[in-house]
Design a protein with these regions (language model features):
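Radical SAM [4Fe-4S] cluster-binding motif and immediate context
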Residues: 12-191
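Glycine-rich beta-alpha loop elements in corrinoid/cobalamin-binding modules
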Residues: 1-8
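Catalytic cores of alpha/beta
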Residues: 132, 193-201
Length: 201
């Protein structure tokens, strides 16, 4: 699907949302509320990480929904289900700074806490543009999950096939913490061909 604006807002009224809220299906230990709205603003990822199926599922071209539609979905969640937190499940929510800042501006007006549990790319933008993290935090983001995968450049380059430099990881984590957010990270151990020395590193 190329144009995500052709998608209707999910018909959550057809689902027993209270049942999900009651069992805490959508929230983590750090969640601000058990009444969580899971939402996607975009689809697609330009990366070709060997372990991931996102490009096969959603394509490699990143497409965003209109901000007005995203805000309407959130407002409907608040009105219909008394939502207390938003979790964005996008794979590349930080890939386009312009879209992210526009999203943050809208979220700041709504005033709900939000996070990115799905893991966002620990890329050049996050390592060298701390203003992105500041904008996220000011709009309510209390926690980010950074997809690091490995601390060994050979593994990132030749096993994971991830366009990420090891020396970008620490600055990205530090920038998120300085902005005031909790930081979770994703790591994968035991890739084919990975040595014990590399795992220990």
């Amino acid at each position: 699907l190329i144009n995500l604006d052709n998608l209707p807002i999910p018909a959550r009224h057809l689902v027993n949302m209270e049942g999900y809220f009651d069992i805490g299906a959508f929230h983590s230990a750090k969640s601000r509320s058990n009444r969580v709205l899971n939402i996607m603003c975009s689809r697609g990822c330009p990366e070709k990480c060997t372990f991931c199926t996102t490009p096969q599922m959603w394509g490699s071209n990143v497409r965003w929904r209109k901000i007005d539609d995203i805000m309407l979905e959130i407002k409907n969640g608040v009105k219909d289900f008394d939502i207390g937190e938003i979790q964005f499940e996008d794979d590349t929510i930080t890939a386009r700074k312009k879209n992210l800042i526009e999203l943050c501006n809208g979220l700041e007006k709504i005033g709900l806490p939000w996070c990115t549990p799905n893991g966002i790319k620990t890329n050049y933008h996050l390592a060298n543009q701390p203003d992105m993290f500041r904008a996220m935090h000011e709009s309510g983001c209390y926690q980010v999950t950074l997809a690091c995968e490995s601390g060994v450049q050979r593994v990132l380059d030749h096993v994971v096939n991830k366009r990420l430099k090891v020396d970008q990881i620490k600055p990205a984590i530090e920038n998120a913490k300085k902005a005031g957010m909790l930081v979770h990270t994703f790591w994968i151990l035991g890739y084919p061909g990975e040595t014990f020395e590399e795992i220990n590193k």
